[in-house]
C-alpha cells in the first residue's frame, strides 16, 4: 500500500520460493523483488521451509515448525544489498528474517552501515526455543547504542518494533 499511496520504490529480498511467486503475481512496476536472503554473511546456506504447507516463512534456524524440507538459497549482506540496488543509504529497512536478525544486528558490517539507515521495522523471534527474550533485550540495547530510538512496539505480540535514527 505504500507503493500505491505514496509512489515509493520498494526493493524486497526473500529467499522463500512461495514469496517470490506471490510477488510476481502483483505486477507492480515500483516493486523489485530479489530471491535472496539478507544475513550477516554472504554465500549460500540451507534454508528450512515451513512444515505447514499453508505457511510461507522459512528460516536459517531449524526449529520445530520448519525443517522437514530445505532448499539451498543465496544470502547477501546489507553492503551487497545496497550495491545491488544502486543506493548508498536505506530510508526504511524492514527485517523479518526468522531468527537471523540477532546475528545481523550484532555484525560489524551492520554497525558500520547503521548511520546510513533512517528507520528499521523489525520482527524479533524471541519466542523460539533457544533464543529467548534476553536476545531481544540485547538487540534493542545495541540498536540504541547505534543511535536508534524505539518509536513503536506491538503491545499485543511484543515482537514487532520500529526504530528511528535519533543520532549518529
Label each PLM-derived region with a short phrase.
Residues 1-168:
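Phosphate/nucleotide-binding beta-alpha loop and adjacent structural elements of enzyme active sites
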Amino acid at each position: 500500500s505504500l507503493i500505491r499511496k505514496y509512489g515509493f520504490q520498494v526493493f524486497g529480498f526473500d529467499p522463500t520460493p512461495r514469496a517470490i511467486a506471490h510477488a510476481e503475481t502483483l505486477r507492480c512496476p515500483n516493486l523489485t523483488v530479489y530471491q535472496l536472503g539478507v544475513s550477516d554473511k554472504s554465500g549460500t546456506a540451507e534454508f528450512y521451509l515451513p512444515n505447514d504447507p499453508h505457511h510461507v516463512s522459512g528460516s536459517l534456524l531449524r526449529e520445530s515448525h520448519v525443517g522437514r524440507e530445505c532448499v539451498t538459497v543465496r544470502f547477501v549482506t546489507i553492503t551487497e544489498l545496497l550495491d545491488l540496488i544502486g543506493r548508498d543509504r536505506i530510508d526504511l529497512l524492514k527485517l523479518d528474517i526468522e531468527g537471523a536478525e540477532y546475528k545481523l544486528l550484532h555484525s560489524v558490517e551492520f554497525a558500520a552501515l547503521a548511520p546510513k539507515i533512517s528507520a528499521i521495522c523489525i520482527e524479533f523471534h524471541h519466542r523460539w526455543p533457544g533464543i529467548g527474550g534476553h536476545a531481544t533485550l540485547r538487540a534493542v540495547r545495541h540498536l540504541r547504542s547505534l543511535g536508534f530510538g524505539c518509536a513503536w512496539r506491538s503491545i499485543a505480540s511484543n515482537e514487532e518494533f520500529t526504530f528511528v535514527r535519533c543520532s549518529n
